[in-house]
From Swiss-Prot:
It is found in: Cytoplasm. It comes from Ehrlichia ruminantium (strain Gardel). GO terms for biological process: leucyl-tRNA aminoacylation. The gene is leuS. This is Leucine--tRNA ligase. It comes from the Bacteria.
Length: 830
């Protein structure tokens, strides 16, 4: 008998109510909130189902759980939609939110819907405009002209974290370098703290912490003074490898380094001024952009040798890291090696390993013994580094210095669909912050997206205003915040009254106890959120340093790809049909679901065909949450069959008891109870450690145990207890069918409000153990004996069991491995 999942899900969802007073909350569960693109995809399903299992389990443990949801609603796709479909970003976004809200509710997620908001709500972004004004007040926001990452497709600036392998994180376009006046947040103020405090995040994946550690990028080194030949000027060079100074053959500086003002050759000046900024190299493009440079004509004196070093302008040196100048030892740095080879510069080896190295092919970057280095000869690299620093300090030309790879966060975006920056520009007063009483600065709705460039700057009236200081004509800032600004504090907004921040509630609820989302946000959203907590604490909004206590990063949902003979992607159903028709089709590997590869499985179709519980259970089965999962049609069908068997087994059992009595039950019944409570204990432990796939396997095992008990007519009190336990432990995973079965077996109240079943610890104590009997190491038989059996009795039993094998042989010795094995060693009679 198949259960009507549509009727069950509709009936149950109407009855659920997960409202909670935030002041009573004891556990805060949050998934990374979605961008309202229009539809919930399978990646969302996995993310939100994991969070829902945790939230439902923690409620069952007796905690008041806060499990809110909102919408990360600003962003470029809304502008693209406005241009493509002639619809305003507001209308497009709200329509998508309505559809996705309906989808989320259909999954059966236990959200506190009364706390829902979208970041495009003016009452939400009013507060981040207020934050920005306070950041200005506390020296955490500033404006400057700087070299920025320009996305020529999206026509906007990107933060360093949004440039991946030299390309825009969203558009995929090759990023150019441009000089623009931008607003920045001073994340570097917290660089040391952000790095050091990673050690305290014991419940974060090590991989995420390592990614942040590398991104923050602490470099401990020294600044060395190089005298410029012919000029009374010193060039300061930062290095983490002072021990290679004897191998230096040139110096490289940034194209905008102040030392270049001393270049007198007109042609050289023109050449440097024409330096192509789009080819500048940072860590995100070190492997994709060719290294090149220009000989500036300037020369520096080597501080320890009677030789001069030419100074090159190089595209791999940036003014915003270190001092904007480096000395280069091509023999022991691959970047320097490539540059030296290109421009025929000397390559001097100063580190010698035991084996010979071929410096014609690549730099040697390993350890070894110093040579060709004067007073450093014969030293190890570590000793040489210390000695060189001591020497240079004694000469008065060196000081120790720490730099960070992390740069301040550029937050200006030349887009319409974002939060307006609350700044006014007055010719008389300069930069004037908007008064807090005049917030929020809202977006105009009559916007034209057909013109290129910044839509707000192109608006005929919006940017024109009066200076709040002098009353003169003035202009608004037409850039908007980077959308990561919104997602960097939303977890605190859920704690507030309205959409602001309630300090007392935030101090109580934060950090979020369980935060679930993709690892792709390790150095974007997660790092920015950590910064925001510190910045808002400095401004007095609350006293919280870390936003998330426990972080769970789920893998992707993948699906096979199908290609025709021309290499065009096919929809899976079309590919399978063509294969059946004998046509040429290549079945590719399973890849992340994407529209471009046509391997997307639509959630609405799955729920309509199999139900929400089937979708939830599939997405949590078989695979640990941190690993990728492959979508297979046969697996979702298998899950659906299990739910129907579960329904039939419980509905058909007509001996349900609600008050269990276990007096005078058989030994078999006791054994079954022990097994049931062992499985319950295993499921509980699996949930505590996020082993959701293991918990699923265990409750399916429990289903089989109950089925066997029913078949063998085991005491109905024992069976009833097992059924009640099963229904309760499956509820976090498959809440609709569980809630309905709870009603059918006579459960009181709503199942989602019932406590987790308690494990009877006495039933976990094994009264008997299985011991393997061996003769000369060969298996004879496994016997069940009391777990407190003494050795002499055990030996007697073993000898009796093995008598036939022993025969007339002599027993030489008997070895016992407690609770596991007894081995009888015999010798043949002469």
């Amino acid at each position: 008998m198949h259960y009507d999942f549509k009727e069950v899900e509709r009936d149950v969802q109407e009855k659920w109510d997960f409202t909670v007073n935030v002041k009573d909350v004891q556990c805060y569960v949050l998934e990374m909130f979605p961008y309202p693109s229009g539809n919930i995809h399978m990646g969302h399903l996995r993310n939100y189902t994991i969070g829902d299992v945790i939230a439902r389990y923690k409620r069952a443990c007796g905690l008041h759980v806060f499990h809110p949801i909102g919408w990360d609603a600003f962003g470029l796709p809304a502008e693209n939609a406005a241009l493509s479909y002639n619809i305003s970003p507001q209308v497009w976004t709200r329509k998508n939110i309505d559809n996705m809200r309906s989808q989320l509710k259909s999954i059966g997620l236990s959200y506190n819907w009364d706390k829902e908001f979208a970041t495009c709500d003016a009452e939400y972004y009013k507060y981040e405009q207020e934050f920005f004004l306070d950041f200005l007040k506390y020296g955490l926001a500033y404006r400057k002209e700087s070299l920025v990452n320009w996305d020529p497709v999206d026509q906007t600036v990107l933060a360093n974290e949004q440039v991946i392998d030299g390309r825009g994180w969203r558009s995929g376009a090759i990023i150019e370098k441009r000089k623009l006046s931008q607003w920045f947040l001073k994340i570097t103020d917290f660089a040391a703290e952000l790095l050091d405090d990673l050690k305290s995040l014991n419940q974060w994946p090590e991989k995420v912490k390592l990614m942040q550690e590398r991104w923050i990028g602490k470099s401990e080194g020294v600044i060395i003074d190089f005298q410029i030949v012919g000029i009374n000027e010193v060039l300061q060079v930062f290095t983490t490898s002072p021990h290679t100074l004897f191998g230096a053959s040139f110096i490289a500086v940034s194209f905008d380094h102040p030392i270049l003002k001393y270049v007198n050759d007109v042609q050289l000046i023109q050449l440097i001024d024409s330096f192509d900024r789009k080819d500048l190299i940072d860590d995100s493009s070190i492997n994709t952009v060719e290294k090149f440079g220009i000989n500036s004509g300037l020369v520096a004196k080597h501080p320890l040798l009677d030789m001069d070093l030419p100074i090159y302008v190089a595209n791999f040196v940036l003014m915003n890291y270190g001092t904007g100048a480096v000395f280069c030892c091509p023999a022991h740095d691959q970047r320097d090696f490539d540059f030296a080879k290109k421009y025929s510069l000397p390559i001097r080896q100063v580190i010698f390993p035991e084996q010979n190295v071929d410096l014609e092919r690549e730099a040697y970057v390993g350890s070894g013994i110093m040579g060709c280095s004067g007073f450093l000869d014969g030293m190890t690299v570590d000793d040489a580094k210390k000695s060189m620093i001591e020497k240079l300090i004694s000469l008065g030309i060196c000081k120790k210095q720490v730099y960070y790879r992390l740069h301040d966060w550029g937050i200006s975006r030349q887009r319409y669909w974002g939060c307006p920056i609350p700044i006014i520009y007055c010719k008389k007063c300069g930069i004037v912050p908007v008064d807090k009483k005049d917030l929020p600065i809202t977006l105009p709705e009559d916007i034209d997206f057909t013109k290129s460039g910044n839509p707000l700057d192109n608006h005929p009236t919006w940017k024109y205003t009066k200076c709040p200081s002098c009353g003169a004509d003035a202009k608004r800032e037409t850039d908007t915040f980077d959308t990561f600004f919104e997602s960097s504090w939303y977890f605190a907004a859920f704690c507030g009254i309205g959409k602001g921040i309630d300090k007392d509630v935030c101090n109580k609820l934060l950090p979020v106890d369980y935060y679930i989302g993709g690892i792709e946000h390790a150095v974007l959203h997660l790092l920015y959120s950590r910064f925001f907590c510190r910045a808002l604490t400095r401004c007095g909004y609350f006293d919280v340093k870390e936003p998330f206590s426990s972080l769970i990063t789920q893998g992707m949902v993948c699906h096979s790809t199908y290609l025709d003979k021309y290499g065009n992607y096919l929809f899976p159903e079309d590919g399978k049909k063509m294969i059946q028709e004998g046509k040429y089709v290549t079945v590719g590997r399973a890849e992340k679901m994407s529209k471009s590869k046509k391997n997307v499985v639509h959630l609405d179709d799955i729920i309509d065909k199999y139900g929400a519980d089937s979708a939830r259970l599939f997405i949590l089965s078989d695979t640990p949450p941190e690993r990728d999962i492959e979508w297979l049609d046969e697996n979702i069908e298998g899950v659906s069959r299990y739910l129907n068997k579960l329904w039939k087994m419980i509905v058909d059992y007509d001996q349900i008891e609600q008050n269990f009595v276990f007096n005078d039950i058989s030994n078999d019944a006791v054994e079954y109870r022990m097994n049931v409570h062992k499985i319950l204990n295993d499921i509980t432990n699996d949930l505590e450690f996020y082993r959701f796939n293991c918990a699923v396997a265990k409750f399916r095992e429990l289903s089989n145990v109950i089925s066997e008990m029913i078949r063998l007519s085991i005491n109905h009190h024992v069976v009833s207890e097992a059924i009640y336990i099963l229904i309760r432990v499956v509820e976090p995973f498959i809440p609709h069918i569980a809630e309905k079965l709870w009603q059918i077996v006579g459960g009181q109240g709503m199942l989602c409000n019932q406590l987790w079943p308690k494990v009877d610890s006495q039933l976990l104590i094994k009264k008997n153990v299985n011991i393997v009997v061996q003769v000369n190491g060969k298996f004879i038989k496994a016997v069940s004996v009391p777990n407190d059996i003494d050795d002499d009795t055990l030996k007697s039993i073993a000898l009796e069991v093995a008598q036939r094998r022993i025969g007339n042989s002599s027993v030489k010795n008997i070895y016992i491995i407690p609770a596991r094995v007894i081995n009888i060693v015999i010798t043949k009679s002469s």
